[in-house]
Amino acid sequence: DEQTLAESIELARRFKAGGLDLLSVSVGFSTPDANIPWGPAFMGPVAERVRREADIPVTSAWGFGEPKLAEEAVKSGQLDLVSIGRAHLADPHWAYFAAKELGVEKSAWTLPAPYAHWLERYR
């Protein structure tokens, strides 16, 4: 809710004053009647507001498992960094497939060098 978000932003300012250099914006489940807008990249607008009002770099992991959503969140300024959690657990080669989907040249080099060399040479 708005009051809790305002309190969180104030807390983020205090963390920054204490030396914090990156804040992970997440959602808590301590409010039983919270209306959480589940969906792809749903934490983006909240993280962007925290970033802007607390003037601190932010990351989030909620709903950014699709490579294009993650890229857009950074390009648009919603996030400074996307934390990929569940997608990496489901596929340890997520970074490779994300790089391919986003058209990264030499996408195999998101993997360790011995694997990248093999993939680039034999695929």
Regions inferred by a protein language model and the residue ranges of each:
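Flavin-dependent oxidoreductase catalytic cores
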Residues: D1-R123
